[in-house]
Amino acid sequence: MAPENPAPASLDDCVAAIRYAVANAAEFGADGSRFAIGGDSAGGNLTAASVLRLRDENGPTARLQLLLYGAFTANNDLPSVIENGEGKILTRQAMIWFYNHY
């Protein structure tokens, strides 16, 4: 992930991994026509972005997305960001840094 590997490297990796897993599902004892993907924080963002890219490229369709507190906006001026931006594990300034390196 960023900053060492800027966007869209992480999205490209996720989509490639999904395509590989679906194409080789039988090898893993799974059904490639029935799969779910999910992630938390940046992983939630990558999950949603992967599903959208696969849709746009007529790729495999996930049956379920599990999006746990995904990072879906770079708007750091939202009331919830300002109200909860200090004293937590991820501060407002840290999130700005992450977004600037995405």
Where are the regions that the model predicts?
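Alpha/beta-hydrolase superfamily serine-hydrolase fold, recognizing
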Residues: M1-Y102
